[in-house]
Amino acid sequence: MTEYLTHDVILNLGDEAPEDLTLNMLRFASRQTTLVIARSPVENNKTLEEALDDQQKILRKKSQAMTLTPAQVTRLGRNEHHVDGREMAIQMMVGDKPYYQLQAACLVPGQQRMLVLNYSKPGPLSDDDISHWRAIKGELRFA
């Protein structure tokens, strides 16, 4: 039997184990920022870099007015429990408004699943926003 834990409930899904494609969206109203946590399966023969390349191709098709910085190696989590991931900055137009995003992605330890954190704001990120993002990345822990 597969059980699935969400923030509010545990669902009994019987014998069928679905792919976890869930999104969590957290809004920080006073900052006007949003943190989106997304999960997706990664094919067994693909690396994190290849999975990110696939994701970027999809994003580019959806938004022509988008700029991405090259992905850089980043550390997610605390000291001995950290994982290496990739981080990039993204700027895109949503309608007539610019959105600024910082994105970090990693493979979930022991699984062939990608976890993506996307921190965004409708306008430039302030130094305080960037510090907040770094704290979120630095304190990440896997369940």
Task: Kindly label every feature range from the protein language model.
Residues Q56-L107:
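Signature of long, low-cysteine stretches enriched in small and polar/charged residues
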Residues G95, G110, P122-P124:
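Short coil/turn motifs at secondary-structure junctions
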Residues R27-A29, C106-Q111:
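Short glycine/proline-enriched loop/turn "hinge" motifs that connect secondary-structure elements
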Residues D54, I58-K62, I136-E139, A143:
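Conserved short hydrophobic interaction patches
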Residues T2-D53:
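Secretory pathway targeting signatures of secreted, lumenal, and periplasmic proteins
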